[in-house]
Amino acid sequence: MTADLLLTHFNQVFCPNDLGHPLFGAEMKEARVLEDGYIAVKDGKILAVGSGEPDASLIGPDTKIQSYEGKIATPGLIDCHTHLVYGGSREHEFAKKLAGVPYLEILAQGGGILSTVRATREASFENLYDKSKKLLDYMLLHGVTTVEAKSGYGLNWETEKRQLDVVGALDRDHEIDLVSTFMAAHAVPPEYKGRSQEYLELIVEEMLPRVKEENLAEFCDIFCEKGVFTADESRYLLSKAKEMGFKLRIHADEIESIGGVDVAAELGATSAEHLMMATDEGIRKMAEAKVIGNLLPATTFSLMEDTYAPARKMLEAGMAITLTTDSNPGSCPTANLQFVMQLGCFMMRLTPVEVLNAVTINAAYSVNRQDKIGSFDTGKQADITILDAKNIDYPLYFFATNLTHQVYKAGKLVVDQGRIV
């Protein structure tokens, strides 16, 4: 079979192993790295990858051939935890952060998430759409081709639905594919202060059924943290969501360890998020339950904390992990996944291969798109990120610079040398 598109002579092509499950523990150390590699694409899907001169059978009279000496290729990068859609911004809290005021104290003062809730409730669909599109454009220019996006800045049905409608519209309109997560349990809204269980009952009885009926989200998430929702409250919400057919996520062990990872393990959550304060016992439980750890080192960086999620302990225990931005207006105002990848090396001591596996094949499993993206297996969508680097180590070593040369989405060139095309 001849290719429509043949990308040749890469210095290296990074090929994650899709073993039929996320890469656990030591499996994350392994990948195929093709020297003088090529990628053949047919009808927007991967036809073949290899080293050296492509087989003549791949080349027909209409095959477009492009050479990439001095470049590397990876599967399209996947940002599997973001709070993409929101109103306003929170630079007015930056001075407090610099002065050492803790995140939960800012929240208790009516700032933090609640500040963004007020701005998001006031924002129109058009305003939220335009703001989120700009973030997606930035992500695409940095090599990202799939993004998970949560609601959670409405905390009422009208605004939560507006956020999810924006995600759905952008999924249709933008080159980046989006995966929706419903997270009305991001905080207790001011009108339910002191009545968190009553608010969760509202979510369970009124919001979740409508989200499912209107097919607005695939995942359900909750913030299990001191001063927000307890482990028992998280168990209540997520068990009800599971009964309705949602896949589960949980923000856990970010600031204190209060049992969120136990809930993740008990309910078979797809992933647990943050995990900076994860204990050895919690890590063991997640490993046994095959819960993916979505790690967000840029949040630790932004909060100016010293404790990063114990990635090496997790791998030694046999967990699967990802790296992702947590892009949001407060605790992590960035949309640069390449920077997050570099933090994975510099602050978590992950190797380049482990990092690249974390943002490709494991991230694909985290968003339930492993059959479509995350590796260069034949038949998967031809999402390809091309970096201006001579080997796979270089973009992790040469930090704080966007090295994206080109991006292909389903075999279509969508980024070319700093421009969206």
From Swiss-Prot:
<keyword id="KW-0479">Metal-binding</keyword>
<feature type="binding site">
    <location>
        <position position="186"/>
    </location>
    <ligand>
        <name>4-imidazolone-5-propanoate</name>
    </ligand>
</feature>
<keyword id="KW-0862">Zinc</keyword>
<dbReference type="GO" id="GO:0005506">
    <property type="term" value="F:iron ion binding"/>
</dbReference>
<comment type="function">
    <text>Catalyzes the hydrolytic cleavage of the carbon-nitrogen bond in imidazolone-5-propanoate to yield N-formimidoyl-L-glutamate. It is the third step in the universal histidine degradation pathway.</text>
</comment>
<comment type="similarity">
    <text>Belongs to the metallo-dependent hydrolases superfamily. HutI family.</text>
</comment>
<dbReference type="GO" id="GO:0005737">
    <property type="term" value="C:cytoplasm"/>
</dbReference>
<protein>
    <recommendedName>
        <fullName>Imidazolonepropionase</fullName>
        <ecNumber>3.5.2.7</ecNumber>
    </recommendedName>
</protein>
<dbReference type="GO" id="GO:0019557">
    <property type="term" value="P:L-histidine catabolic process to glutamate and formate"/>
</dbReference>
<feature type="binding site">
    <location>
        <position position="331"/>
    </location>
    <ligand>
        <name>4-imidazolone-5-propanoate</name>
    </ligand>
</feature>
<feature type="binding site">
    <location>
        <position position="83"/>
    </location>
    <ligand>
        <name>Zn(2+)</name>
    </ligand>
</feature>
<feature type="binding site">
    <location>
        <position position="328"/>
    </location>
    <ligand>
        <name>N-formimidoyl-L-glutamate</name>
    </ligand>
</feature>
<feature type="binding site">
    <location>
        <position position="326"/>
    </location>
    <ligand>
        <name>Zn(2+)</name>
    </ligand>
</feature>
<dbReference type="InterPro" id="IPR032466">
    <property type="entry name" value="Metal_Hydrolase"/>
</dbReference>
<dbReference type="GO" id="GO:0019556">
    <property type="term" value="P:L-histidine catabolic process to glutamate and formamide"/>
</dbReference>
<feature type="binding site">
    <location>
        <position position="81"/>
    </location>
    <ligand>
        <name>Fe(3+)</name>
    </ligand>
</feature>
<dbReference type="GO" id="GO:0008270">
    <property type="term" value="F:zinc ion binding"/>
</dbReference>
<keyword id="KW-0378">Hydrolase</keyword>
<feature type="binding site">
    <location>
        <position position="326"/>
    </location>
    <ligand>
        <name>Fe(3+)</name>
    </ligand>
</feature>
<feature type="binding site">
    <location>
        <position position="90"/>
    </location>
    <ligand>
        <name>4-imidazolone-5-propanoate</name>
    </ligand>
</feature>
<dbReference type="InterPro" id="IPR006680">
    <property type="entry name" value="Amidohydro-rel"/>
</dbReference>
<feature type="binding site">
    <location>
        <position position="83"/>
    </location>
    <ligand>
        <name>Fe(3+)</name>
    </ligand>
</feature>
<comment type="pathway">
    <text>Amino-acid degradation; L-histidine degradation into L-glutamate; N-formimidoyl-L-glutamate from L-histidine: step 3/3.</text>
</comment>
<dbReference type="GO" id="GO:0050480">
    <property type="term" value="F:imidazolonepropionase activity"/>
</dbReference>
<dbReference type="Pfam" id="PF01979">
    <property type="entry name" value="Amidohydro_1"/>
</dbReference>
<dbReference type="InterPro" id="IPR005920">
    <property type="entry name" value="HutI"/>
</dbReference>
<keyword id="KW-0963">Cytoplasm</keyword>
<feature type="binding site">
    <location>
        <position position="153"/>
    </location>
    <ligand>
        <name>4-imidazolone-5-propanoate</name>
    </ligand>
</feature>
<feature type="binding site">
    <location>
        <position position="81"/>
    </location>
    <ligand>
        <name>Zn(2+)</name>
    </ligand>
</feature>
<keyword id="KW-0408">Iron</keyword>
<feature type="binding site">
    <location>
        <position position="330"/>
    </location>
    <ligand>
        <name>N-formimidoyl-L-glutamate</name>
    </ligand>
</feature>
<feature type="binding site">
    <location>
        <position position="251"/>
    </location>
    <ligand>
        <name>Fe(3+)</name>
    </ligand>
</feature>
<feature type="binding site">
    <location>
        <position position="153"/>
    </location>
    <ligand>
        <name>N-formimidoyl-L-glutamate</name>
    </ligand>
</feature>
<keyword id="KW-0369">Histidine metabolism</keyword>
<feature type="binding site">
    <location>
        <position position="251"/>
    </location>
    <ligand>
        <name>Zn(2+)</name>
    </ligand>
</feature>
<feature type="binding site">
    <location>
        <position position="254"/>
    </location>
    <ligand>
        <name>4-imidazolone-5-propanoate</name>
    </ligand>
</feature>
<dbReference type="InterPro" id="IPR011059">
    <property type="entry name" value="Metal-dep_hydrolase_composite"/>
</dbReference>
